[in-house]
Regions:
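ABC transporter nucleotide-binding domains
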Residues: 2-4, 9-211
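Non-catalytic surface loops within mature trypsin-like serine protease
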Residues: 26, 124, 232-234, 270-272, ...
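The C-terminal cap of the DNA-recognition helix in HTH/winged-HTH DNA-binding domains
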Residues: 118, 180, 245, 285-286
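A short linear hydrophobic-aromatic micro-motif
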Residues: 121, 250-255, 290-295
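C-terminal coupling/interaction segments
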Residues: 269-320
Length: 320
């Protein structure tokens, strides 16, 4: 478990992180989102012990990061955006070197390295120089070093940046596999990745925690209204007449041109996020207007992110 209480980080007169609090539990993958300059990187550096907070407290399984840093850091595995690799070492040499730095007992070192290689599927590359590895496998080696010692908390900063689509899928699957045994914090600018991989999402803006919850919870909270795309066989006056009696509808737009199948493309905007597809279908059926298709446009995590950061983006701080 990692907990932050009223964390503040200032650089001179500039406040990068402003009274940030959170409590993260093992067994979940947390997505950490924020626009450039939101204070995200500064917060992650404090979580991992690279920076000390100006005030406030960060504890790892009850150990204070400032008062007992060695014990607190022993629970953390960290993959920075650019993995700290040595190109002239083989994969195995590098992992054994990191295992020694982490003070893993020499008798356990070989088994720990083998376990990390197995989890990240790099065992067949153990004798290869790191300089000869692809970007995807370099990321795997970086993740393997984070897993050495089986730390309870895994912190990943932009783990799929620069990877090709197949490599991205492989790394995401690997991250998902860590969930049962670890607490995983994933920082990413790729909102679809966070939505797909993470159990909960934290959104930070101007150094403050603006939202935390599951993607579904945040999408429901910020839904506001719903939009429906409907293909209908009929004429514009008939459609508008049928829908005019529904109190939940705010606006109806009808395309000027019919589709190839002769249907009208109708966009319906409602006053709330409540699902009224059944009411729409009944209203159209009551005047014998066939509905070929009806889809509800869902609120996306991207929509939530833009709304949350936009409400705070009023000439505030530029944080790191």
């Amino acid at each position: 478990m990692i907990e932050g209480k009223e964390i503040v980080k200032t650089f001179g007169a500039h406040t990068a992180v402003d009274h940030l609090s959170f409590r993260l539990e093992k067994g979940k993958i947390y997505g950490f989102l924020g626009p450039n300059g939101a204070g995200k990187s500064t917060t992650m550096n404090m979580m991992t012990g690279y920076l000390a907070p100006t005030s406030g407290e960060i504890t790892i399984n009850g150990y204070d990061m400032l008062k007992d840093p060695e014990k607190a850091k022993s629970y953390i595995g960290y993959l920075p955006e650019i993995p700290p690799l040595y190109n002239d070492m083989t994969v195995e040499e590098y992992l054994e070197f990191v295992a020694e730095l982490k003070k893993i007992p020499s008798k356990k070192r070989r088994d720990e390295v083998a376990s990390a290689e197995k989890k990240t599927l790099i065992g067949t590359y153990a004798d290869r120089l790191i300089r000869h590895l692809s970007k995807g496998y370099r990321q795997r080696v970086g993740l393997a070093q984070a897993l050495l010692g089986d730390p309870e908390i895994i912190i990943l900063d932009e783990p799929t940046v620069g990877l090709d689509p197949q490599q991205i899928i492989e790394i995401r699957n690997l991250i998902r596999s860590l969930k049962e045994q670890h607490l995983v914090i994933l920082s990413s600018h790729i909102l679809s990745e966070v939505n797909e991989v993470c159990d909960e999402v934290m959104i930070i803006s101007h150094g403050k925690m603006e939202e935390i919850g599951t993607p579904a919870e945040l999408e429901a909270k910020y839904a506001g209204h719903a939009t429906y795309q409907i293909a209908i066989i009929g004429e514009e006056p008939q459609v508008k007449g049928a829908l005019s009696g529904l109190s939940g509808i705010q606006k109806v737009d009808i395309s000027n041109q019919k589709k190839e199948d002769g249907s009208l493309l109708v966009t319906v905007y409602t006053k709330s996020s409540e699902d009224i597809r059944a009411e729409i279908a009944r209203a159209l059926a009551s005047v014998s207007l066939p509905v070929l298709s009806m889809t509800k446009e869902e609120q996306s995590l991207e929509d939530v992110f833009l709304k949350v950061t936009a409400r705070e983006n009023k000439g505030g701080n530029q944080n790191k």
